[in-house]
Amino acid sequence: MAISKPEVLHDKHLLEQFDCGNPSLNEWLLRHARQAQSSGSAKTFVISDDNIVIGYFSLTVGQVETYETPERIRRGMGQYPIPVVILARLAVSINHQGLGIGVGMLQDAIRRTLMISEQVGIRALLTHPIDDRASNSMSALVLFPLPSEKNNWFCY
């Protein structure tokens, strides 16, 4: 098994066999990831084994209202919205869960966010976990909750 490093989703990647156990995450990868990438609305990165996707995450950009952010993030921003990178989706195939692939992809997303922040104004990485299980994973990884919404997490 030669698992790849995270790389940008390409036509060579095989998506049809991907199953993370969550139908909406499976469907988004299969039906929307390439379209979002070609339109520029999100960039998807995949981990694959012989081009068969076994994990993916998608990044996009957005903003959060100043009053919704922790003091550490809003300091010096006045009343302007806070620019963030959004970890829109992260999923690992059922057969590969529990091997650290999800943590590795999150680390890669954080690294990419840091690289982006060297070029443009970004204050944090924001996640929107899809369910309580994902939210619990985010809290275990030392991400910080968005004060106004319990299922949104910051990394800064």
Residue ranges and their predicted role:
Residues 88, 93, 130:
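Residue-level recognition of the GNAT/N-acetyltransferase active site
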Residues 1-35, 39:
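Short amphipathic alpha-helix that is part of the acyltransferase structural core
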Residues 40-61, 68:
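Conserved beta-hairpin
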Residues 42-46, 56, 84, 89, ...:
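Short hydrophobic/aromatic beta-strand element in the GNAT-like acyltransferase core
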Residues 98-112:
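Conserved acetyl-CoA-binding loop-helix of GNAT-fold acetyltransferases
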Residues 106, 131-134, 150-156:
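Short glycine/proline-centered loop/turn elements that form peptide/ligand docking sites
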Residues 58-89, 97:
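Conserved acyl-donor/pantetheine-binding loop and adjacent beta-alpha core of acyl/acetyltransferases
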Residues 114, 120-122, 128-148:
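Conserved active-site alpha-helix within GNAT-family acetyltransferase domains
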